């Protein structure tokens, strides 16, 4: 175990306190978030029209359609399983939480199609505080990792196999 694992709860508390109560802490996190995330991830399709045997014009039409269809999903709050934020806002939240907490998890789920949302993909954000090893529910590192029936280890709420791969 490292010093960070043993002190992560206290480190998160201090970072959040600085973010909420010290203007310089708030500015540092927000400026970093804005500089790194910017307007967010957007598709830039580049179709190899020669390989596909289509014209440049057909490829340009398909590229426009891809951007349009992505925007239908990304600009809607229905991309968020909680129906609160659009994809670009979720990116800002994830990066902000990562800076404050050291990690953030994004789960992919599938909802129902609707007449105004033809895509089922939904994203769920899980803050690092919600991830813990069974028995350490308050996020305090107790120095012990758990071993599963399959021989995998659970360390700080994340299950890994013998090679260190997250499972």
What do the PLM-derived regions correspond to, one by one?
Residues 30-167:
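Structured, mid-chain assembly/scaffold modules that mediate subunit interfaces
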Residues 24-25, 40:
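Conserved small-residue
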Residues 1-17:
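Intrinsically disordered, low-structural-confidence terminal and linker regions
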């Amino acid at each position: 175990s490292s010093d960070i694992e043993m002190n992560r709860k206290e480190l998160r508390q201090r970072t959040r306190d600085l973010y909420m109560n010290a203007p310089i802490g708030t500015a540092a996190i927000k400026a970093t978030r804005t500089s790194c995330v910017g307007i967010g991830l957007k598709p830039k399709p580049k179709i190899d029209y020669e390989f596909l045997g289509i014209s440049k014009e057909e490829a340009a039409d398909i590229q426009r359609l891809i951007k349009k269809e992505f925007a239908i999903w990304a600009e809607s709050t229905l991309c968020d399983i909680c129906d609160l934020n659009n994809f670009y806002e979720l990116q800002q939240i994830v990066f902000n939480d990562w800076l404050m907490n050291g990690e953030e998890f994004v789960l992919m789920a599938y909802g129902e199609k609707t007449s105004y949302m033809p895509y089922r993909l939904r994203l769920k954000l899980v803050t690092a505080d919600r991830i813990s090893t069974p028995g350490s529910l308050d996020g305090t590192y107790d120095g012990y990792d758990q071993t599963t029936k399959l021989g995998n280890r659970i360390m700080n709420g994340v299950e890994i196999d013998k090679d260190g791969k997250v499972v």
